Amino acid sequence: MDAGGAGPFGAIGHVGDGGSARDGSGWDPPPGSSAGPCSDVTHHIYLVSPSQELFSFHPAGLELHRIGRLRCGDGGPFSMAVDRNGVAWIVDWNGPVSRVDIATGRCETTPYKVEDGAPFRNFGMAFAADDGPDQETLYVRDAVFFNDTDGANPARTLGVFDRRSYAVRPLGQGAGANADLTGTGDGRLFGFVKQSGASFVSEFDKLTGATLSERALPGVTIGSSWAFATWGGAFWFFVTNDEDALSSRVYRLDPDSQAPPELVMPVLLTAVIGAGVSTCAPTEVPH
């Protein structure tokens, strides 16, 4: 995410000229890729920088591995999610959504189109598990910029990104300003919210978009970009260091503890604007 209302509008985005809709949930990485349904590479956190560099981050050892530079989109990444097949979905600042093989960095642009100024041109995004086995849904939460109407009680709309029709179906609004999203293998959806100089982690209702809970994050100051993911039963927050825009701070939060977020890496050697983790990621730290 970069620091850069509810209504009865219909689905947003469509299949554009020059491309036909396929079952997006079945888009597979290319032959020779090590990605695949819940393969080993889907068990990490993936990061994308403002300069389109793709990385894998291994929380157990605090290791960062560069995969390569992406060649999709022309406005720079805005947010990212990763599915169970090892495909990253990245929304661009200019609105397009691309799919990326997380093992190789190969990418292609989807037909998703939204006009400038329309809802869901930019959004936080994440997959969360469904009730059925091996099923998941891509959730997106609208991001609003240069909006003087937020006041003291901002709200944003949650939607579902349909990977067959390349359209967003709005669900409803929840309290809180712009947020990056992360989902869990047990079906919950959370947001890392920046609001009025403070930061929060919130849980959202996947049916209505309502904010179910909110927890302040003392000591976590969001600058020009931020992202987060869940791994090993904890939340991992990535916040760009504004005094050095080429690096980030990494915080870890145990949701079952009342302790504040722990700064685990003062300097991660990349700025981070998007983070994604699949619903295959471990819910406990592997031994």
Model-assigned labels for residue ranges:
Residues 247-287:
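Blade-level signature of beta-propeller repeat domains, shared across WD40, Kelch, NHL, RCC1
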Residues 44-48, 86-91, 133-141, 188-192, ...:
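Conserved beta-propeller blade signature
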Residues 35-37, 74-85, 116-130, 173-186, ...:
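Repeated scaffold domains used in trafficking and secretory/extracellular systems
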